[in-house]
Amino acid sequence: MEALVYTFLLIGTLIVIFFAVFFRETPRIIKK
């Protein structure tokens, strides 16, 4: 059960980082 929780936290962290980078890079993409 603990493994499932740690996996969920890991995936959640990766998703947060992905969206943070995505929204940060969006203005540059739009300017192109």
UniProtKB/Swiss-Prot annotation:
InterPro entries: PSII_PsbT (IPR001743), PSII_PsbT_sf (IPR037268). GO terms for biological process: photosynthesis. The chain crosses the membrane at residues 3-23. It is a single-pass membrane protein. Its main location: plastid. GO terms for cellular component: chloroplast thylakoid membrane; photosystem II reaction center. Keywords: Chloroplast, Membrane, Photosynthesis, Photosystem II, Plastid, Thylakoid, Transmembrane, Transmembrane helix. It is found in: Plastid, Chloroplast thylakoid membrane. Pfam families: PsbT. Found at the monomer-monomer interface of the photosystem II (PS II) dimer, plays a role in assembly and dimerization of PSII. PSII is a light-driven water plastoquinone oxidoreductase, using light energy to abstract electrons from H(2)O, generating a proton gradient subsequently used for ATP formation. PSII is composed of 1 copy each of membrane proteins PsbA, PsbB, PsbC, PsbD, PsbE, PsbF, PsbH, PsbI, PsbJ, PsbK, PsbL, PsbM, PsbT, PsbX, PsbY, PsbZ, Psb30/Ycf12, at least 3 peripheral proteins of the oxygen-evolving complex and a large number of cofactors. It forms dimeric complexes. Belongs to the PsbT family. HAMAP family: PSII_PsbT. This is Photosystem II reaction center protein T. It comes from Phaeodactylum tricornutum (strain CCAP 1055/1). The gene is psbT.
